């Protein structure tokens, strides 16, 4: 048995170099015309920047292998980007510095040329990706935030190297490593305000999206179940759920209160939330319980109501 942190650094560096060589060889083999690529100097620089972090190496390869771009140009672009916006003495190098520099470089490459007025939408989409209770698809993010599905997917595609992302807009997307949410929600690490995510603001946005969606769509007997029949006795219950309750509404019903919990780190009056929350509790409460019942998560109602009660007491 071995302990990962006890492995010699030279062995880790060697493994990362092998990973880079194998990945570049696969890319060159698939595309052709990439003889003697990358150069030894480029490979050495990538290994130096990786600083023993496989997550850095993986994100680098994902960035270079962008499905619509020239990998050679992607590598050149990445190596030309500054490693950081602040001075870094090697003796004072923090463990996350190299990875943070890569993440920031990828974000700047993807969105740096955007108009400033587009930044709030980009931040909203990034916030949904990193703060979602469960991974969300482009279509669900679009529904909750009131955006176009195509627009959301294009924004996510721009940072595909940081995500697990499929071509299907209905397939959930998520960060490919936990270090990305940690980075983008920490202002001492993500020092570009265009990309930093302040969790309470984006929990608020997702919460309002969930509540509005439930207020719009919830109705009595969503799954058209026969009266007087227990859920367990309905043979095609899940087929009815799939037909009548889409993923966006399921997420809203099961997760809204968890976004409300996310606001407790920065309590402040938020009239928009109070208004839609009151409407939900007064008009859609019983229909919501019905949905939780068919989803098999009715027990969550107790926790959700407790959280809502505490919020309304404060606000």
Tell what function each PLM region has:
Residues 1-207, 212, 221-226, 232-243, ...:
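Conserved NB-ARC/NACHT P-loop NTPase core of NLR-like innate immune receptors
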Residues 238-263:
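Amphipathic alpha-helices of TPR/Sel1-like and other helical repeat/solenoid scaffolds
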Residues 217, 232, 260-267:
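Secondary-structure edge/capping motif, primarily at the C-terminal ends of alpha-helices
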């Amino acid at each position: 048995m071995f302990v990962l942190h006890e492995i010699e650094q030279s062995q880790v560096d060697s493994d990362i170099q092998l990973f880079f060589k194998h990945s570049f060889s696969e890319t060159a083999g698939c595309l052709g015309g990439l003889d003697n690529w990358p150069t030894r100097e480029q490979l050495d620089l990538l290994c130096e920047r990786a600083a023993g972090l496989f997550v850095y190496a993986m994100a680098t390869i994902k960035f270079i292998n962008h499905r619509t771009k020239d990998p050679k140009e992607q590598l050149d672009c990445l190596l030309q980007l500054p490693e950081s916006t602040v001075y870094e003495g090697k003796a004072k190098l923090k463990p996350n510095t190299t990875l943070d520099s890569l993440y920031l470089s990828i974000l700047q490459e993807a969105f740096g040329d955007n108009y400033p007025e587009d930044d709030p939408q980009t931040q909203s989409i990034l916030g949904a990706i990193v703060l979602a209770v469960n991974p969300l698809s482009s279509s669900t993010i679009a529904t909750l935030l009131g955006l176009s599905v195509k627009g959301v997917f294009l924004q996510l595609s721009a940072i595909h190297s940081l995500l697990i992302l499929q071509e299907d807009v209905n397939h959930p997307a998520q960060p490919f490593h936990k270090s990305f949410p940690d980075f983008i929600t920490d202002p001492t690490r993500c020092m570009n305000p265009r990309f930093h995510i302040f969790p309470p603001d984006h929990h608020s946005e997702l919460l309002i999206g969930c509540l509005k969606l439930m207020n719009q769509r919830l109705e009595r007997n969503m799954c058209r179940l026969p009266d007087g029949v227990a859920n367990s006795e309905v043979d095609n219950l899940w087929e009815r759920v799939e037909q009548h309750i889409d993923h966006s509404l399921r997420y809203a019903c099961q997760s809204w209160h968890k976004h409300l919990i996310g606001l407790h780190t920065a309590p402040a009056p938020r009239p928009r939330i109070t208004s839609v929350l009151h409407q939900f509790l007064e008009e859609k409460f019983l229909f919501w319980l019905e949905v939780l019942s068919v989803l098999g998560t009715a027990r969550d109602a107790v926790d959700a109501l407790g959280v809502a009660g505490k919020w309304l007491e404060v606000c």
